[in-house]
């Protein structure tokens, strides 16, 4: 089952400008990685002061929309439990996350898209 909202991933054309802006609002840059093997598209985690959630900055123009990431205990287990639910569309089945664990992407019956993250 869903545990919490992990982060909100948002698109930016200029990662460094956005990092500086969100730091001025009190967020802290806590990690940085690449979204692809070619190291063309960056992901930067900006943590809120209470440490419970993040804004993730991304610069991939093919993903220029907001994504809500939901933490689950076990991504593969969640997928197995819901893969036969005809109201759920699986955009991406579980795959390894470069930061550890797994990721899957689902579309809910109300057409909202959620990125599931966990082990």
Predicted regions located by residue number:
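Core segments of cupin and vicinal oxygen chelate
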Residues: 2, 9-52
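Vicinal oxygen chelate
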Residues: 4-14, 25, 32-34, 60-119
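Short acidic/glycine-enriched loop/turn segments that link adjacent beta-strands
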Residues: 37-41, 63-64, 97-102
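Short secondary-structure boundary/capping segments
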Residues: 45-47, 59-60, 96
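Short, charged/polar, Gly/Pro-enriched secondary-structure boundary elements
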Residues: 50-55, 111-114
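Short, basic, helix/turn surface patches
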Residues: 55-64, 117-119
